[in-house]
């Protein structure tokens, strides 16, 4: 607008021919924030000789780096960089023409201060328990409104009177604690400008150290190279620094002291007497310090100085010495490790061979007439009220060689190699040699004689080639304690002598069990088996039967009934077969009737019972058949009989009654006659759950659910069909009406359907004829008054056969539950379902 006015005035001057001087400034009033920059343009219309700027103090402005002047023809630009409060005021732009006439224009510059946070420190730290003042210096023009927020909530709204905003806008927290730690927001607002700014200040609460010393008293043993670790842990915030002091002096790590875990562990090494006393642990951080002391008590623990292994000879004398020191002087005890027997000063063993003698810190264990059982480990224990020390030694007893095995007699024969073992124990170990007479074995030209060592044994392997190899052999064992020898004899083995005491212990028509006693001599070689020869008296040929191993009992089978046999027994070893025993004669039993059969039974499937026949005495002739008679016990019915082939091992009784008791007699028959009957009684179980035991037995859950759904659908279909025929309603009737448009009831047969009198039979099926009647339609039987079926168009001309059941009162009735109706060749036949077999 001012620019247009200038051009307008310029036009007037040109038009009037006069050059009047006019000055304008682009802005008349400006608000500027401290630190911002701004420029102003002054335009002089006319013929200005100069254009100058004057500051609010009236001083002519000279261009500087911060306040800069730029002239462009009739324009002069004043630029103020980084304005401050002192720059506020009225600035004048003055133009001067050649005649010295001046014109000026002014601009008002207002400087305001934005929200300014000065020297805001974060984090700010305080000591727990003190009254804290969180400093936040904020200024602006006009003065700001300051608020504090903690966890996005103004502290003035927190229900804790420990928080308050002071007049200097600082936040006061009384009795500050660790839970007050966090980030606090100092927020300033200038309502006039809608200006807002904030600073987040981290508040840290320092907690003075608190020392935790799990153990304050320690015991240690001096001058034994031991070490002791003192533990000092401290809590606090920030983590405290731990230092150890001894006699007021700071402990530093060296050969004596080891510091670990940020000085939480002090290890005192190579403890000596002067290391005893107090050790002070001091913990320090910004919030303060804490200290506690631990006490190290140094003792001289028992220590065994002298204990060494000893060696002695069998039947000799030895003294075991144990010396120990300590403060107080320890007591010394001995323990024999092999049996745990303890020996103290003055003790003696029951046999008087072992005795303990002792004096100040020294104990001696005396053993006389040393036995091999005295060898082994001995423990010496030195103990006092402050501890103990234990060491072990070994008593080694040397002795001359001893032969372990008592077997000195061996048997073999020519061509049969044998090993003779010389088992020797000795301390120190012995050297073992085999000799025959004075010849050291093995010798030249004795390839059939070999020796080899296996552990402490020296094996002599002999493969006899002649009688000269049988005889005496000598095993000699030698160590520095002595020499021992033992003689071994190799005898020529023989076949066993004859068994004796042969007798028959069991006899039947076809088998015989014999027993006998072992022979008095096995010939020097173990018996392999026994051979039993058997033949008929009139026969020349012996049949050979071998025993199972060395059993002295043999069963002869496949014999002929009522026949006389001869038997003899011989023992067989590696050398061969021995002499036979004397011949024994026996006669098998004649063929006779079989013995009563042995049986046991169990319920079978359905209404049947299974009787199993165990193997029995058939009397010497095969069983031809079993005659089975059975009847119910409850009603004492007539006996029912069935026959089973003799080669069967079980009998099945069928068509029995549930929960009924039965009596059974079973007789076995062979070609000579019948056995005595075996009587057996049993009771049938109750009737099972048909659905559970038949339909669902072994089916999975899915199959059972499927069957249930199928059954439900079947019930719905049957119900709908019944409604169709009886009530002329239901889904099927609805479909029929829709398809046919009228009821299917015009025939005489439909009329009978409505009256419920017609019977229906499925084409080609074997399902029973089902007759429908109303309740009042009954025809009485002329004989017993029972209802009978009224003839109709579907009734067969022949009456069905009825099998009556007899009740206890003798009256014959027709039980509906026992009738099974079948259709065959257009004739209905009825029969009883539960027929007694």
Swiss-Prot record:
Disulfide bonds join 42-93, 136-186, 232-281, 322-380, 422-475. Residues 20-697 are extracellular. GO terms for biological process: axonal fasciculation; cell adhesion. Residues 789-798 have a biased composition (Low complexity). Residues 764-785, 799-810 have a biased composition (Basic and acidic residues). Residues 1-19 form the signal peptide. Residues 719-837 are cytoplasmic. The modification Phosphothreonine is found at residue 780. The modification Phosphoserine is found at residues 765, 786. Residues 495-591, 593-688 form the Fibronectin type-III domain. One of its GO terms (cellular component) is synaptic membrane. The keyword Glycoprotein applies. Residues 21-108, 113-202, 208-297, 302-396, 401-491 form the Ig-like C2-type domain. GO terms for molecular function: identical protein binding. The chain crosses the membrane at residues 698-718. PANTHER family: CTX-RELATED TYPE I TRANSMEMBRANE PROTEIN (PTHR12231), NEURAL CELL ADHESION MOLECULE 2 (PTHR12231:SF231). This is Neural cell adhesion molecule 2.
């Amino acid at each position: 607008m001012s620019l247009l006015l200038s051009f307008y005035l310029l036009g007037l001057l040109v038009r009037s021919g006069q050059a009047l001087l006019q000055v304008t400034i682009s802005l008349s009033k400006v608000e500027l924030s401290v630190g911002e920059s701004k420029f102003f343009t002054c335009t002089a219309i006319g013929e200005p000789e100069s254009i100058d700027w004057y500051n609010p103090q009236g001083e002519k402005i000279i261009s500087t780096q911060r306040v800069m002047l730029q002239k462009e023809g009739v324009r002069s630009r004043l630029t103020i960089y980084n304005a401050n409060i002192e720059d506020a005021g009225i600035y004048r732009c003055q133009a001067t023409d050649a005649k010295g006439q001046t014109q000026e224009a002014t601009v008002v510059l207002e400087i305001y201060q934005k929200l300014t946070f000065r020297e805001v420190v974060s984090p700010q730290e305080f000591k727990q328990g003190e009254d804290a003042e969180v400093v936040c210096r904020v200024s602006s023009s006009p003065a700001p409104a300051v608020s504090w927020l903690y966890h996005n909530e103004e502290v003035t709204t927190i229900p804790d009177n420990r928080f308050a905003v002071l007049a200097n806008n600082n936040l006061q927290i009384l009795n500050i604690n660790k839970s007050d730690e966090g980030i606090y927001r100092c927020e300033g607002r200038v309502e006039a400008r809608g200006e807002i700014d904030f600073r987040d200040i981290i508040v840290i609460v320092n907690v003075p150290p608190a020392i935790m010393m799990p153990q304050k008293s320690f015991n240690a043993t001096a001058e034994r190279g031991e070490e002791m670790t003192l533990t000092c842990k401290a809590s606090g915030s920030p983590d405290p620094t731990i230092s150890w002091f001894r006699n007021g002096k700071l402990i530093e790590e060296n050969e004596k002291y080891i510091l670990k875990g940020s000085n939480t562990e002090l290890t005192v090494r190579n403890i000596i007497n002067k290391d005893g006393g107090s050790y002070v642990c001091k913990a320090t951080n910004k919030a303060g310090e804490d200290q506690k002391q631990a006490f190290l008590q140094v003792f001289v623990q028992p220590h065994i100085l002298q204990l060494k292994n000893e060696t002695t000879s069998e039947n000799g004398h030895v003294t075991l010495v144990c010396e120990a020191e300590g403060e107080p002087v320890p007591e010394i005890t001995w323990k024999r490790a092999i049996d745990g027997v303890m020996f103290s000063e003055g003790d003696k063993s029951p046999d008087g061979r072992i005795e303990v003698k002792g004096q100040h810190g020294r104990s001696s264990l005396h053993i006389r007439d040393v036995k091999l059982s005295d060898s082994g480990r001995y423990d010496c224990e030195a103990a006092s009220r402050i501890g103990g020390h234990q060491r072990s030694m070994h008593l080694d007893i040397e002795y001359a060689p001893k032969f372990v095995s008592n077997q000195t007699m061996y048997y073999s024969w020519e061509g049969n190699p044998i090993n003779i073992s010389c088992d020797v124990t000795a301390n120190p170990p012995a050297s073992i040699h085999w000799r025959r007479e004075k010849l050291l074995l093995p010798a030249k030209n004795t390839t059939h004689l070999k020796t080899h060592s296996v552990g402490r044994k020296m094996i002599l392997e002999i493969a006899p080639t002649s009688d000269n190899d049988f005889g005496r052999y000598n095993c000699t064992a030698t160590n520095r304690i002595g020499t021992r020898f033992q003689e071994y004899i190799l005898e020529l083995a023989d076949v066993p002598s004859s068994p004796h005491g042969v007798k028959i212990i069991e006899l039947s028509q076809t088998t015989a069990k014999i027993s006998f006693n072992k022979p008095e001599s096995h010939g020097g070689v173990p018996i392999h088996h026994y051979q039993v020869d058997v033949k008929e008296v009139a026969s020349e040929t012996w049949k050979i039967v071998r025993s199972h191993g060395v059993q002295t009992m043999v069963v002869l089978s496949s014999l002929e009934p009522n026949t006389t046999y001869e038997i003899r027994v011989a023992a067989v070893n590696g050398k061969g077969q021995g002499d036979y025993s004397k011949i024994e004669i026996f006669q098998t039993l004649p063929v006779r009737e079989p013995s009563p059969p042995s049986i046991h039974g169990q319920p079978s499937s359905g209404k049947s019972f299974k009787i199993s026949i165990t193997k029995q005495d058939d009397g010497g002739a095969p069983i031809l058949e079993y005659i089975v008679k059975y009847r119910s016990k409850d009603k004492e019915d007539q006996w029912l009989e069935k026959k089973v082939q003799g080669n069967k091992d079980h009998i099945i009784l069928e068509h029995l009654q549930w929960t009924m008791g039965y009596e059974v007699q079973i007789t076995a028959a062979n070609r000579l006659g019948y056995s005595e009957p075996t009587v057996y009684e049993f009771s049938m179980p109750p009737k099972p759950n048909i659905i559970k035991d038949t339909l669902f037995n072994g089916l999975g859950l899915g199959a059972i659910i499927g069957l249930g759904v199928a059954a439900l659908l079947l019930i719905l279909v049957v119900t709908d069909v019944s409604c169709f025929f009886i009530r002329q309603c239901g889904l099927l009737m609805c479909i029929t009406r829709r398809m046919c448009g009228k009821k299917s009831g015009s025939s005489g047969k439909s009329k009978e359907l409505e009256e419920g009198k017609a019977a229906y039979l499925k084409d080609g099926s074997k399902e029973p004829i089902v007759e429908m009647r109303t309740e009042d339609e009954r025809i009485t039987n002329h004989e017993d008054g029972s209802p009978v079926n009224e003839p109709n168009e579907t009734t067969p001309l022949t009456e069905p056969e009825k099998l009556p059941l007899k009740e206890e009162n003798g009256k014959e009735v027709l039980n509906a539950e026992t009738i099974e109706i079948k259709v065959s060749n257009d004739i209905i036949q009825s029969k009883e379902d539960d027929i007694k077999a």
